[in-house]
Design a protein with these regions (language model features):
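A short, structured beta-strand/loop element
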Residues: 13-54
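Short, surface-exposed, charge-dense and proline/glycine-enriched linear segments
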Residues: 7-9, 32, 69-72
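Negatively charged, low-complexity tracts enriched in Asp/Glu with abundant Ser/Thr
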Residues: 1-13
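Acidic, low-complexity intrinsically disordered segments
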Residues: 51-87
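A generic structural signal for short beta-strands and their flanking turns/coil linkers
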Residues: 7, 21-23, 59, 68
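Structured catalytic/translocation cores of nucleotide/phosphate-coupled proteins
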Residues: 2-5, 34-38, 86-87
């Protein structure tokens, strides 16, 4: 990824999946008129849907998630479920 490139990260509130607390994340960027995205889950730091990112870029995103799991959960705890889904 280019250092000058704008990459947006959107996070959900804390949710439950298989009786475990999780946060859904989405990285997005616009490149050449197309919306690239990678949707994943923390704390697994895995991605469910990816479009437009290379394998190397996805590896960088996974590394970012692993390094920031606690920060992501702290921010997600501030989000009200209704507020998230109404955006």
């Amino acid at each position: 990824m280019d250092q000058q490139e704008t990459l947006n990260l959107t996070i959900s509130s804390v949710m439950r999946k298989d009786n475990e607390k999780v946060v859904h994340v989405r990285f997005e960027r616009d490149q050449e008129g197309k919306k690239h995205f990678a949707e994943g889950i923390v704390p697994e730091c895995s991605f469910e849907k990816i479009y437009g990112f290379t394998e190397e870029e996805v590896a960088q995103l996974k590394f970012y998630l692993k390094e920031h799991v606690q920060d992501i959960f702290k921010e997600a705890q501030k989000i009200n479920d209704k507020e998230f889904w109404l955006k």
